[in-house]
Amino acid sequence: MFDVFTRVVSQADARGEYLSGSQLDALSATVAEGNKRIDSVNRITGNASAIVSNAARALFAEQPQLIQPGGNAYTSRRMAACLRDMEIILRYVTYATFTGDASVLEDRCLNGLRETYVALGVPGASVAAGVQKMKEAALDIVNDPNGITRGDCSAIVAEIAGYFDRAAAAVA
C-alpha cells in the first residue's frame, strides 16, 4: 500500500530521476486539498452505518429475490455477511480516499473478490448494484456544502466515485 507521496517518489527513484515539476505540482495540489480529503473521509466514516444499511435496503427493494427463501441474502447469517462485505468495501474506499491511492483498495479488498463470490454463488451484479448505491449515498454526503472546508471538491468527489466504480467493476 502506497500513499500518493510514496508512489511518486518510488516511481522517480526506480527511473533514477528527480521529481519533475509536474509531479511536484500534483503533490502540492494533494497537500492543498488535504483538509477537503479529511473532511470527506470523516463524513463517509461518520455515516457508514446509514450508507450501508440504506444501500442494502434499496438493493433488496429492487431485487427482492435476494432476501426470499433460496436467495443469497436469505437467513440472518447470509444477510449479516452481505452487510459486512458492503461495510468492508466502504471502509477500503475511505482508506483509498485518505491516501489518495487505490492500491490499498485493490490489494487488500478487491483482489480475488470476484472469484470468491463466484465460488460462493453470490451474484456479482447484485454486489455491484449495492456498491453503486453506496456510491450515490456517499457522494451525496460528501457533496453537502455545510460544515466542510470551503472550495472546489469536484476532484475529490470524482476520485471517490472512481474508487466505488473500481469496486463495482471488480465484482461484476
Swiss-Prot record:
This protein's GO CC annotations: phycobilisome; plasma membrane-derived thylakoid membrane
Ligand binding ((2R,3E)-phycocyanobilin 1): C82
Location, primary (coarse class): membrane
SUPFAM superfamilies documented for this protein: Globin-like (SSF46458)
Modified residues (N4-methylasparagine): N72
Sites where the protein binds (2R,3E)-phycocyanobilin 2: C153
Post-translational modification: Contains two covalently linked bilin chromophores.
Source taxon at top rank: Bacteria
Residue ranges the record marks as coiled coil: none
CDD domains per the UniProt record, alphabetical: PC_PEC_beta
Subcellular locations according to the entry: Cellular thylakoid membrane
Subunit details: Heterodimer of an alpha and a beta chain, which further assembles into trimers. The trimers assemble into hexamers, although these were not seen in the crystallographic studies. Part of 2 PBS rod complexes, the conventional CpcG-PBS rod and a photosystem I-specific CpcL-PBS rod, both of which include ferredoxin--NADP reductase (petH). Interacts with rod linker CpcC2 via the latter's N-terminal PBS-linker domain.
NCBIfam families named among the record's database cross-references: phycocy_beta
Known role: Light-harvesting photosynthetic bile pigment-protein from the phycobiliprotein complex (phycobilisome, PBS). Phycocyanin is the major phycobiliprotein in the PBS rod.
Name by which UniProt lists this protein: C-phycocyanin beta subunit
